[in-house]
Amino acid sequence: MATQIEPTTQEPRSRTGRSLTATRPLMGWRTVDILTIAFLGAALGVAFWGWGVFYNGPITALKIGYAPLMGLFSGPWFLAGVVGGLVVRRPGAALFCEVVAALVSMLPGTEWGATVLISGVLQGLGAELVFAIFGYKAFGLAVASLAGAMLIGPVGWWWAGQ
């Protein structure tokens, strides 16, 4: 009689052995989730504002030197959606964090004005789309990288139309 082998369904694990998938339903928001995203978004918003002040010097030099490298300096603005979605693994966390960061960076004043808020909404929606595709259950490096790449699409499309 042949021995039957049962298929195993092992979930992905990090190097430390922790699960990279959600272990319980993630639909409900707790107060700590809202506060975490609010503070994280505010901190990233201050960082975004600071980056905006620093941004013009290198960009001006790159416009003269080698313009295709200008995109490398846009990376920090794409952090909030991915980080928010990874830290608070709830539907809407990436969008919430990105919008809070955009609001905070807009309030002291930027050269881009209220368009920062539109950009933040588009970036948050891009990250949310990727997390939703994976059912808010996978949060590893591949999903985070894909979410970061997806942020660029809607924002690039919108800025190109400006």
Predicted regions and their residues:
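Hydrophobic alpha-helical transmembrane segments
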Residues: 34-39, 75, 79, 91-99, ...
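Interfacial aromatic-anchored transmembrane helix boundaries in multi-pass membrane proteins
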Residues: 61, 65, 101-128, 159-160
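Cytoplasmic membrane-interface segments at the C-terminal ends of transmembrane helices
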Residues: 20-33, 84-89, 128-142
